[in-house]
């Protein structure tokens, strides 16, 4: 079966193929939101130990530390991803809980009122929170696995994706 063709183009490349930051000055200012998730998969024995300890490690509260790190990452996304616009973040919320016997689910929702979306901020927040969980737990095992990390929804731009949260 032949591959589908699309007229979509990469927005961060100019007509000469050089990398560029998208000019959003002509876009409408709208309420924007995005939700992303990342998951941390633990070996069974590590998950059992974490559950028994109330998600606390020798370094402190795992969930609390992941929320702080994820929030810091959301606010600094434009410093990490070259063509992300610096955005006035109006809200950032994390939900972190078990999604199965050995999997910790991290959901990050970001909101702002601006000309461009906050998908990268939500993805960065969820990713850094997951990396922080790994860091907090690596003394117990290096067999943890992070992923998938994915966009669950976005609202307020040209097209909405996923279910509203």
Swiss-Prot record:
Metabolic or biological pathway: Cofactor biosynthesis; molybdopterin biosynthesis
Residues reported in the UniProt entry to bind substrate: 83-85, 120-121
Catalytic activity of the protein: (8S)-3',8-cyclo-7,8-dihydroguanosine 5'-triphosphate = cyclic pyranopterin phosphate + diphosphate
Domain of life: Bacteria
Swiss-Prot/TrEMBL GO biological process terms: Mo-molybdopterin cofactor biosynthetic process
Enzyme Commission number, as recorded: 4.6.1.17
Keyword annotations: Lyase, Molybdenum cofactor biosynthesis
Active site: 135
MF terms in GO: cyclic pyranopterin monophosphate synthase activity
Family: Belongs to the MoaC family.
Role: Catalyzes the conversion of (8S)-3',8-cyclo-7,8-dihydroguanosine 5'-triphosphate to cyclic pyranopterin monophosphate (cPMP).
Subunit structure: Homohexamer; trimer of dimers.
Protein name: Cyclic pyranopterin monophosphate synthase
Organism: Xanthomonas campestris pv. campestris (strain B100)
Organism placement in taxonomy: Bacteria, Pseudomonadati, Pseudomonadota, Gammaproteobacteria, Lysobacterales
Gene name in the database record: moaC
């Amino acid at each position: 079966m032949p591959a589908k063709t699309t007229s979509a183009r990469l927005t961060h490349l100019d007509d000469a193929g050089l990398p560029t930051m998208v000019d959003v000055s002509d876009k409408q200012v709208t309420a924007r939101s995005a939700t992303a998730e990342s998951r941390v998969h633990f070996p069974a024995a590590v998950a059992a130990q974490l559950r028994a300890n109330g998600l606390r490690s020798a370094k402190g509260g795992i969930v609390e530390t992941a929320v702080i790190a994820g929030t810091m990452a959301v606010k600094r996304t434009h410093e990490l991803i070259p063509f992300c616009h610096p955005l006035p973040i109006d809200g950032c919320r994390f939900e972190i809980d078990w999604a199965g016997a050995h999997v910790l689910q991290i959901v990050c929702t970001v909101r702002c009122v601006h000309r461009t979306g906050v998908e990268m901020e939500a993805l960065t927040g969820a990713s850094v929170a997951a990396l922080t969980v790994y860091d907090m737990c690596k003394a117990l095992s290096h067999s943890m696995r992070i992923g998938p990390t994915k966009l669950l929804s976005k609202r307020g731009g040209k097209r909405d994706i996923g279910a509203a949260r």
